[in-house]
Swiss-Prot record:
Reaction(s) catalysed (UniProt annotation): 1-(2-carboxyphenylamino)-1-deoxy-D-ribulose 5-phosphate + H(+) = (1S,2R)-1-C-(indol-3-yl)glycerol 3-phosphate + CO2 + H2O
Name this polypeptide is given: Indole-3-glycerol phosphate synthase
Protein family: Belongs to the TrpC family.
Species whose genome carries this gene: Kineococcus radiotolerans (strain ATCC BAA-149 / DSM 14245 / SRS30216)
InterPro entries: Aldolase_TIM (IPR013785), Indole-3-glycerol_P_synth (IPR045186), Indole-3-glycerol_P_synth_dom (IPR013798), Indole-3-GlycerolPSynthase_CS (IPR001468), RibuloseP-bd_barrel (IPR011060)
Transmembrane segment boundaries: none
Pathways involved: Amino-acid biosynthesis; L-tryptophan biosynthesis; L-tryptophan from chorismate: step 4/5
Gene Ontology MF annotations: indole-3-glycerol-phosphate synthase activity; phosphoribosylanthranilate isomerase activity
Enzyme Commission code(s) on record: 4.1.1.48
Signal peptide start-end: none
Enzyme class: lyase
Top-rank taxon: Bacteria
HAMAP family for this protein: IGPS_A, IGPS_B
GO annotation (BP), single: L-tryptophan biosynthetic process
């Protein structure tokens, strides 16, 4: 069993428990009371080329399977506020509990604290989780190609859009890129971390980005430790980077985000973009 298989087994168990507590109709009622989802796709890749650069998705992340405990984060809302003040375009919130120490309550707290779009980062295997995401205020949801059969991927992308949210479709191989595009993914995240082995290789993004059309938002996930990495991913064609561990382990998350944002907006970055 791979790490991903193990995570998914736990996700399904926890999902069954939540379904027993809250019906789908109750979730739908909560979701319909939410204000409309924000347009994350448009913010990550503005139509005006002068406003593009490389955007930053800053993550609230307590633990990871590869590194264990990263940060306690007693107040995720306060951390998200610092990210927003630093210039993050989107705030990502881990909601998987067993391996990442997250929760839907973290998502709710962050949604109430910031004005920028919020991403629910979890292992989605069922449309119930999309309704959960909308009910707790998410504007974006992560869909991992490696965790889904093609029919399910297509269905979940369609449901995400019907709820007004943006689907961030995560890939790690050329085959997964093809599957994502066949499913009409419009925002594709290339995870430089192999979810089956947890190894990181920043060359993964450079290898796969050319397979993703220009009209699709390209996001580099994992492997960002500083501004230099932002420039390297820009050179490979990134529209945005998703950063978690570096930020939660640092002493000044606002400054750390601001440094990455500044690197992404620098004229030199525009010059190196393909």
């Amino acid at each position: 069993m791979t790490v991903l298989d193990d995570i998914l087994a736990g996700v399904r168990e926890d999902l069954a428990a939540r379904k027993a507590l809250t019906t789908l109709d109750e979730l739908k009622e909560r979701a319909h009371r939410q204000v409309p989802a924000k347009d994350a796709q448009g913010l990550l890749k503005p139509r005006d080329a002068e406003q593009r650069g490389v955007k930053v998705i800053a993550e609230v992340k307590r633990r990871s399977p590869s590194k264990g405990a990263l940060a306690t984060i007693p107040d995720p809302a306060a951390l998200a506020e610092q990210y927003e003040l630093g210039g993050a375009t989107v705030i990502s919130v881990l909601t998987e509990q067993r391996r990442f120490g997250g929760s839907l309550e973290d998502l709710r707290a962050v949604r109430c604290a910031v004005d920028v779009p919020v991403l629910r980062k979890d292992f989605v295997v069922d449309s119930y989780q999309l309704w959960e995401a909308r009910a707790w205020g998410a504007d974006v949801v992560l869909l991992i190609v490696a965790a889904l059969e093609q029919e399910a991927l297509v269905s979940l992308i369609e449901r995400t859009r019907s709820l007004g949210m943006t689907a961030l479709v995560e890939v790690h191989t050329a085959e997964e890129v093809a599957r994502a595009l066949d499913a009409d993914a419009r925002v594709v995240g290339v995870n430089n971390r192999n979810l089956k082995t947890l190894e990181v290789d920043n060359a993964t993004f450079a290898d796969l980005a050319p397979l993703i059309p220009d009209h699709v938002v390209r996001i580099a996930e994992s492997g960002v430790s500083g501004p230099r990495d932002v420039v390297e991913f820009a050179r490979a064609g990134a529209d945005a980077v998703l950063v978690g561990e570096t930020l939660v382990r640092g002493e000044d998350p606002r400054r750390a985000v601001a440094d990455l944002v500044a690197a992404g907006a620098h004229p030199a970055v525009q010059a190196v973009r393909p």
